[in-house]
Amino acid sequence: MKSIKVFPIFALLLVAALSIAACSPKAAPDQPASTPNEQPAEQPTENPFNQTALGECYNPFNPIMEGKVWKYAMVSNKVSSTLEVSYKDVTPSSFTTVQQFPDIRTEVQWTCGPDGMLSSQFASMSIAQIPDVQFETMEVKGVLIPKEDKWQVGYTWDTGYVIKVKFTSGETVFEGQGNMTVTNTISAIEPITVPSGSYSEAFRVDIAGNMMMSIMGTESTIPLTYTTWYVKDVGMVKNASADPTISYSMELVSLE
């Protein structure tokens, strides 16, 4: 059935919208992943963004800098692709993340509060394969990026979303609801090497949970098990999953 074909693609888009899994439904031709640069990465000599001006949106583990672009290389099922992340409309209490995939552009509004950063809605997307995607956030729980003082080994926090969704495939309009819950744990501080360079202290966050979707009578529960590495004053440098349902790796290539 058509809905069965659309569902796996849509599930991946939801994960990408949360910035936790990056799989473009129409990726670039198969090519080997970028070879990591063995040279040490340049470490910031001073804070690259203004703490006073950013207010509650200041967080060195997810630095918000307008005019900068984080470029990532992605590999999913041996297929390579790219992602560029930038920020706009930055205020002391909110900002917008712009994610540019080869065939998808998303914009996600975030809010900042005393507990950390939270994307208060799913992305408004421009998708060639699935036009007119509409998300309505029904409920949000927890934060995605906790405050700086919480970044210690052993710290755990939960994130959850309940959403309604509507999109078009061909001449068919699909409607459904999703429930996504994950538990995040800072498990270690360890060295890591990615295409952008080598970092001696990367905070490894292990994430586990489930995404339950019901679209036009088709129901599915997708287990989410992946790991993200953050470097202070750089942000996310790697995000990866070995789960056969959503298998991918995303690594920072440059920050320009």
What are the residue ranges of the model-derived segments?
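Bacterial signal peptide processing site
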Residues: S24-K26
